[in-house]
A protein has these predicted regions:
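N-terminal beta-strand motif that seeds the catalytic metal site of vicinal oxygen chelate
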Residues: 1-17, 72-77, 130-140
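Short, flexible active-site-adjacent loop segments at beta-strand->alpha-helix junctions, enriched
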Residues: 7, 56, 81, 120, ...
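Core segments of cupin and vicinal oxygen chelate
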Residues: 8-50, 54-57
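Exposed loop/turn and edge beta-strand positions of beta-sandwich/beta-sheet ligand-binding modules
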Residues: 36, 71, 110
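A short, acidic/glycine-rich surface segment
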Residues: 37, 57-63, 133-135
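Short, flexible turn/loop "capping" segments at secondary-structure junctions
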Residues: 65-70
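Vicinal oxygen chelate
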Residues: 89-140
Length: 140
């Protein structure tokens, strides 16, 4: 089994679409209108996709941008290397996106990641998969 898609309601459909396509290599493969809801589907390298939805009857979140809470707390996107995590984090920061934490090494072969906020204030972790990290460090 694997995740099919993640769906996010947004008041900033264009900005969110641009963010996930420009910085994470997504490609819009479908746009539709269903009553008062507009949806944009963004495909990535694997079978998982992101559905962004703008619906007038869904109000804004009462949470502050980046605020942690029970329930879904972040999206993690795997980068191909630690260098890519560093480069993308620096680019996002330069372009004005809030960085929750800079690239951080959580141990020799476990985690290397940063965290930024998307235009809606959702946390997005930019990670290196454990297998890639181990290979970069010659740990097999």
């Amino acid at each position: 089994m694997y995740f099919g898609h993640i769906a996010i309601y947004t008041e900033h459909l264009t900005a969110m679409t641009d963010f996930y396509c420009r910085y994470f290599g997504g490609t819009v493969f479908y746009e539709g209108v269903y009553g008062d809801q507009k949806s944009v589907y963004i495909a990535f390298d694997q079978d998982c996709y992101l559905e962004l939805m703008d619906k007038a009857s869904v109000g804004p979140s009462p949470l502050s941008p980046g605020e942690e809470r029970q329930g879904l707390t972040h999206i993690a996107i795997n980068a191909e290397s630690t260098a890519r995590v560093n480069e993308l984090t620096a680019r996002l920061e330069k372009d004005g996106y809030p960085v929750v934490w800079q690239p951080t090494d959580y141990g020799t072969d476990r985690f290397y990641e940063s965290c930024v906020l998307d235009p809606d204030g959702n946390r997005v972790e930019i990670c290196v998969h454990e297998k890639v990290l181990r290979a970069e460090r010659g740990l097999g």
